[in-house]
């Protein structure tokens, strides 16, 4: 952790203005803060649940939810990194595990749902999930505070099929809401309707030019452009294989039709995190921890964010990227995913 004497909230407020006005034309001079970590002294604050954090979602009340793969929970934070609603009373959501999972839950991706679709039940009542989680054990679950403030509920369990979910996004097609989930083991993007029913046809999400041995990994929907990253699979098709030049990025519409190949290999290395910052696409590599920036339209490489010493920003085990109010928040599963960081770039 870089020592600071100025309160984090003050630093971030000033830095946000610089980020917004400068954008990536300021290729150097970026900085960051580790807001939370499970290791005392690594973050400004310590949260024992920040173990291999992946997905990041922004709520309607301007708080941030971070999914902790290693702890099987999601935690709510204020934008300055403090736990919400208070340090003494953090809001922690327990994620359910698949029936075939004999260990703990292992959530990865998350998306905020502001629609009236995607209902989940606590056994008595059914309400739209505000947060939708996907997990490596093939579980899709949803949370609504009016069902249970501290527990998500099962929506779909495909653990018995061998499904391994790494990412999730939502989209609208023909005035209906759909859920898109990257099944890394099966090597395709699954589509679910607004009632969590798997769509067998009609959403191909296919690219015949992706080499064998690669599978959909990360996914985000930016204004109807569904961006999917591809990573190399290991022999069991369970995890990614980090290696330089190993990765592809495609753009689909919400029907799952391929619009274009955006990026092929090059600087990619098991890419997962995605964000649009100042109109440019930021891509986070899990493989080498670096962030690469591309033209969001034609995929041309624009550079890598660097610090004041011209050193590329690099975060061991980099997972999620999420931009908000001039910041780019990130998560990382440091020390071979045994520990974690939730931080912010400015």
List the predicted regions and their residue ranges.
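Bacterial N-terminal signal peptides
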Residues: 11-22
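Residues at the start of alpha-helices and the adjacent loop-to-helix junctions
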Residues: 7-8, 19, 45
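Bacterial N-terminal signal peptides that target proteins for export
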Residues: 2-12
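Sequence/structural signature of beta-propeller domains
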Residues: 26-346
């Amino acid at each position: 952790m870089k020592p600071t004497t100025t309160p984090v909230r003050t630093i971030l407020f000033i830095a946000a203005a610089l980020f917004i006005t400068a954008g990536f034309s300021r290729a150097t001079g970026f900085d960051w803060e580790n807001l939370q970590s499970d290791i005392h002294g690594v973050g400004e604050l310590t949260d024992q649940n920040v173990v291999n954090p992946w997905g990041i979602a922004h709520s309607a009340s301007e708080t941030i939810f971070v999914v902790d793969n290693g702890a099987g929970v999601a935690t709510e934070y204020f934008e300055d990194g403090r736990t919400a609603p208070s340090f003494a009373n953090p809001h922690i959501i327990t994620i359910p595990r698949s029936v075939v999972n004999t260990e703990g839950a292992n959530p990865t991706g998350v998306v905020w749902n502001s629609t009236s679709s995607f209902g989940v039940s606590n056994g008595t009542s059914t309400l739209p999930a505000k947060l939708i989680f996907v997990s490596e054990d093939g579980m899709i679950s949803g949370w609504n505070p009016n069902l249970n403030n501290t527990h998500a509920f099962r929506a779909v369990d495909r653990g018995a099929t061998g499904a391994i979910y790494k990412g999730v996004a939502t989209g609208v097609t023909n005035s209906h809401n759909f859920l898109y989930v990257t099944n890394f083991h099966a090597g395709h993007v699954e589509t679910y309707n607004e009632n969590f029913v798997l769509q067998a046809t009609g959403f191909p999400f296919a690219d015949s030019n992706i080499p064998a041995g690669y599978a959909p990994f990360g996914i985000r929907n930016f204004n109807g452009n569904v961006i999917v990253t591809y990573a190399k699979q290991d022999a069991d098709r369970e995890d990614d294989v980090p290696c330089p030049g190993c990765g592809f990025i495609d753009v689909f519409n919400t029907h799952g039709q391929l619009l274009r190949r955006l990026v092929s290999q090059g600087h990619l290395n098991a890419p997962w995190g995605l964000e649009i910052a100042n109109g440019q696409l930021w891509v986070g590599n899990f493989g080498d921890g670096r962030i690469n920036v591309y033209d969001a339209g034609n995929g041309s490489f624009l550079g890598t964010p660097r610090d004041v010493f011209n050193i590329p920003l690099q975060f061991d085990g980099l997972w999620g990227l999420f931009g908000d109010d001039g910041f780019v928040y990130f998560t990382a599963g440091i020390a071979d995913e045994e520990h974690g960081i939730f931080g912010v770039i400015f």
